[in-house]
Amino acid sequence: MKKYAPYIFIVGLFLCLYGTLQVRPIRWDMTDDKHYSLSEASKALLRQTDAPIEVTLLLDGDLNAGFRRLKKATEETIEEMGVYGNLSLTLRSREGTKLQDSLGLRPIVIHEREQNGKTAQTTVYPYAIMQYKGRKAVVTLLKNTRGLSGEENLNASIEQLEFAFMEALHLLQQQETPRVAILEGHGEPDEAHTYDLMSALSKYFAVDRGNLSPTLPSREGDTVPVNVHILDGYKAVLVIDPQTAFSEQERFIIDQYIMRGGAVLWAVNGVRFSEQALQSNGFTPILPLELGLTDMLFRYGVRVNPALVQDIQCLPIPVNVSNDPQSPNLQPMPWTYAPLLLTSQGSPITKNMGQVMSTFVSPIDAVGGEDGIEKRVLLATSTASRVTATPGEVDLNDLNPDMTAFQYQYVPVAVSMEGVFQSAFAHRMMPEGIESDEPIRKTSARTRQIVVGSGSILLNETQKGQALPMGYDRYSGMQFSNRDFAANALLWLTDSEGLISLREKSVVLRLLNDKRAHEKRVQVQVISTILPVAILAIIGGIVLVVRKRKYERV
């Protein structure tokens, strides 16, 4: 019995270890980029589930190598999700179009050139359907960013898989839709020009529009005081392209809303101009736009400058180059006042996002130094920009500017801020017309703000009374990432669970050299097939020789 004791001990230890791992499995992600790990925010969200979750994967069929990689990564993400929380995930693939058509999902057509020179066409549905407690959510697996190659888009899609599934699960778990408010009363764009913005936000929020001005008369003829808590029911407030100044009461209400932890998206221009005058006369003067917000924003940590940026990387506009008014000849010409903005890869708001379309944008400076506010540039110009100060003039004839004047690089036009802010009313009296039962708050709870140097980024154009998509240029037919920017900005402002940070996940893209792979193809095939057999043959031969010599001695 003692002879077999070590073996019994080893077998017993193995069985105990196996039983322990069955009850409490240990998962160890040894990849550099933690590709197979979920964040703590995702684990917490999954543990909150109290009913089974069913996932139907529609990405199936005759897929190329890139989409097979995306499918495998999706299955791995779903498998990892199944480890945490009270849930049961099922993976099913469907090739038919009945389910897809019922949900209005559009397929992606892939054209690939085969080795014989022919072009093959494949239709795929890069979607997954998530069901929880009778509710459904569509998860889009493929993120198609303009300007990126196919491999880069697939890699970006893999990076965003965890966020895509967690976002869908968060929406399915949500019992009450959070509310956001768009402020009015200062010449802001009408609902027709914010239609697509409201449509994009309606997936996540209930969107209200309202006026803060205390204009309702009382019986005594005075205005009715406005309660300082009027905005407290909203997760975030949007100030989009105002044209007239804010009153002292409105400024105070917004300031104290921020002090109580409210989040604000400011999309304000530093310059006053007239697009109508530009279209009818061919030019418009540009002057500083006085909104009464300069001191507030400066106190919070940024300054929207009374100037406009110009950029060589810009949208074209149709211009009549014909001298004959009876025979117009419209040609696309670069319009430097409509810059195509670069997005920062260092923020979860703009990571893996394409360019953002804009017109008449003011530059933004970060101020305050060591004020404890974390500031990140979200949008910036290209490496060939210039800044036009006010007062000045914008002229349509200025379509061939001096290229040597574009000396600025990466001018910030959108900045995010997070931290504890100082009140703009810290050492001032409370304005008249305010109803409040508490003293002025001088410092805020930890909160977030975003400042954008133009309202155009969040607006859509209209054509024949119909709203066009946000970020769509009707002259070139190109679609930019304005819609994603708006949605991600609001998700970041209102994110208390840390889910938006999942967009910062990075997966290293390790690509083969296609040319070298083709040249070495036969060599690699020979080595991978013959070498293992040769090694086995050598080992087998050595074993036979050793055994033969051993038994010859006997």
Predicted regions, residues:
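Glycine- and acidic
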Residues: R27, D60, E184, L278-Q279, ...
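Juxtamembrane extramembrane loops of integral membrane proteins
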Residues: Y4-T244, E248-R251, N269
